[in-house]
Structures are given as structure tokens and as C-alpha cells.
Amino acid sequence: MSPQELKARIASGLLSFPVTHFNADFSLNLPSYQKHVAWLSGYDAAALFAAGGTGELFSLTPQEIGEVTRAAKEAAGSVPIISGCGYGTELAKDIARRAEQAGADGLLLLPHYLMEVPQEGIYQHVKAVCDSTGLGVIVYNRSNSVANADTVARLADACPNLVGFKDGTGQTGLVRRITAKLGNRLSYIGGMPTHELFAQGFNGLGLSTYSSAVFNFVPELALRFYKALKAGDEATMAQILDSFFFPFADIRDREKGYAVSIIKAGVELIGHTPGPVRAPLTNLTPQEKDMLKALIANAGS
């Protein structure tokens, strides 16, 4: 898939990122992962992110990222697979190479590791990764790597394979500056935790689409909300927010890191075998899983 084909594809519909499946000893469980990816691919997702943030990129080795990406690509049929990528520049370039060899259709470049850096540093880092690969790249603004509109424009000028921008900051003013300055040069993705909670507010900022974590275990509900957003169906969105997303967020917010853990728990509760999260994340308690189970049952009623 060419970078421009990827740009068009990610703007065409809802996106999601399968959780990475582990065995009880925390080793990769690729057969279980592929079963889940194949199931998700039967729904109407524009693309899936392998080894993204919800896929616990931060707990995977570069070799494992390549293995997960290859497994996803084998299982996904015609659905494009975008590999997570991140950390320091040289490590990110290595991950990008492995992802390309594994058959990825694109890269999602998560923040560099830990350090606070100036805009020039962000520019040099993203450019180096883009220059190292022929894949289309989506840059992810969040945490300690927040490019401003001028930096994103410089990168778009310098990197013909930079095709997407994903926001995880929630800074509406910054997002609008970027979408206004870059226009149709990029596709724009909403990437806040449980983005459905923010989707209506971000809808007028020029975003093309967003990524849905709950698509992992309630894909029909996730798609119903997405279609209501695109249709301007405020009543349907309000009903889904009130009956599912608000109580879901209440469970998610009980502990730090549950934005990932609760998704893996949801996948388990519908009959898949994703296994535990890797440390330093922690799993939901039995009581919290019961709360989520009841919420899922209600969502299907």
C-alpha cells in the first residue's frame, strides 16, 4: 500500500487497535491474537493498528513488535495493518524496518522515550524515522512529543510519506491550528483515551476519523456510535454515551493504566483469550470485571 493510499484509507472509516495477546507466563500468544484480529476484520474498520498503545507497544521488544505485526497482517485479510513504532530515534528506525519486513501497510509513530525536547528535536526525530522507511507514517501528538503547527508543516514538506496526524493531547486550539494550516495534506485522527467521549467536541476541528478502543470487544456498538457521529444523530450518541461510555469511563478511571487493562478485560469477557497485561500495568479486579461484564451485557440488549 502506497503512502497516499494509506492516507485515503485511514480517512475512510473507523480505526481500532487490537490488544496484544499473552500466555499466562507473559509470552506472546499469537494464535489467540490472530483469531481476535480475524474476528475484528469481519467488521467495518478502515484499518487496524498492531502493537499500538492499547496493544502494549511499550512492553514489547522490537522483535515482538515485528512478530505481532506479521501475525496481524496474516490474519486481517484485506484490512490494512499499521504497526506501532516509537522510543528513541535509532530504536524507532529499527522498529520501522522490522515492521516493513513484516508486511505492515504503515506506521504509527508514538512519542520518543521520556525526554522533553524542543520543536527542532521533534522535527529531527520524526524526519529520521520517515526517511528510514518507505511506509506511510502517522505522527502521534501526545505526552512529551507535541509538535506545533509549524513543525507539522515542516515535516509534511520534508517527508512525502508523512500522511497522517493523530492527536492524543486534547488541546483543541492546537488541533485546529494544525488542521487549518495543513488542510488536506494529511489525514487527521482523534486519539484521546476512549475518544468517543470527546468525539462530538472534536468533530468540528477538521478530524477525518478516530480510533476506538472498545471496538476490540463491542465492535457493533462502536460502529453505531461512529455512524451516528457522521450522520449528526445527537440522540443516538447521547443514548450510547449515557448507557455505555460514561459508566465504562467510571470503571476505567478507578486505576491508572486501566485505559489498556479494561480493553483486555472486555476482550476476555466476550470469549477470547487475550491473557494478562504485562507489568507495570495491572489487571482489573474480579469485582471490576463483573461491573464490566454487566455493562457489556446491557450494551447488547
Curated annotation (Swiss-Prot):
One of its GO terms (molecular function) is 4-hydroxy-tetrahydrodipicolinate synthase activity. Pathway: Carbohydrate acid metabolism; D-glucarate degradation; 2,5-dioxopentanoate from D-glucarate: step 2/2. GO terms for biological process: D-glucarate catabolic process. It catalyses: 5-dehydro-4-deoxy-D-glucarate + H(+) = 2,5-dioxopentanoate + CO2 + H2O. Pfam families: DHDPS (PF00701). Coiled coil: none annotated. Its EC number is 4.2.1.41. Keywords: Lyase. InterPro entries: Aldolase_TIM (IPR013785), DapA-like (IPR002220), Dehydro-deoxyglucarate_dehyd (IPR017655). Belongs to the DapA family. This is Probable 5-dehydro-4-deoxyglucarate dehydratase. It comes from Bordetella petrii (strain ATCC BAA-461 / DSM 12804 / CCUG 43448).
